[in-house]
UniProtKB/Swiss-Prot annotation:
Transmembrane segments: none annotated. Keywords: Biological rhythms. The lineage of its organism: Bacteria, Bacillati, Cyanobacteriota, Cyanophyceae, Synechococcales. This is Circadian clock oscillator protein KaiB. Has 2 forms, fold switches to a thioredoxin-like fold (KaiB(fs)) when bound to KaiC. It comes from the Bacteria. May undergo a major conformational rearrangment; in the free state forms homooligomers. When bound to KaiC switches to a monomeric thioredoxin-fold (KaiB(fs)). The active oscillator complex is probably KaiC(6):KaiB(6).
């Protein structure tokens, strides 16, 4: 079994707004449940550190960025939906085994010929 990856995440918030606090609460629950011991989270308040937001091109809050492992992924806005957060950061699919992913028929849900006549 290979060692688990380490995840580096940055959460950009604007003060202690309800959206910011909800994002932080949801994210901590996800990390403690699914990524315990293999993550580092940096919370950046863009009101206190506007230069960091500018450097990282953050235009809206809350924004969650997965820095490592590559590729960098961002999810902006409501972070209260656990599954949406995991899918948006491309973390959910890493947990699935190959047999889980390919359990359906090749022509089932994901057809590359969709929309062709």
């Amino acid at each position: 079994m290979s060692p688990r990856k380490t995840y580096i995440l940055k959460l950009y918030v604007a003060g202690n707004t309800p959206n910011s606090m909800r994002a932080l609460t949801t994210l901590r629950e996800i990390l403690q449940t699914d990524f315990k011991g293999v993550y580092a989270l940096k919370v950046i308040d863009v009101l206190k550190n506007p230069q960091l937001a500018e450097e990282d091109k953050i235009l809206a809050t809350p924004t969650l960025a997965k820095i490592l492992p590559p590729p960098v992924r961002r999810i902006i806005g409501d972070l209260s939906d656990r599954e949406r957060v995991l899918i948006g950061l491309d973390l959910l699919f890493e947990e699935l085994s190959e047999s889980d992913f390919f359990s359906g028929s090749p022509d089932s849900e994901f057809s590359s010929d969709e929309g062709k006549s």
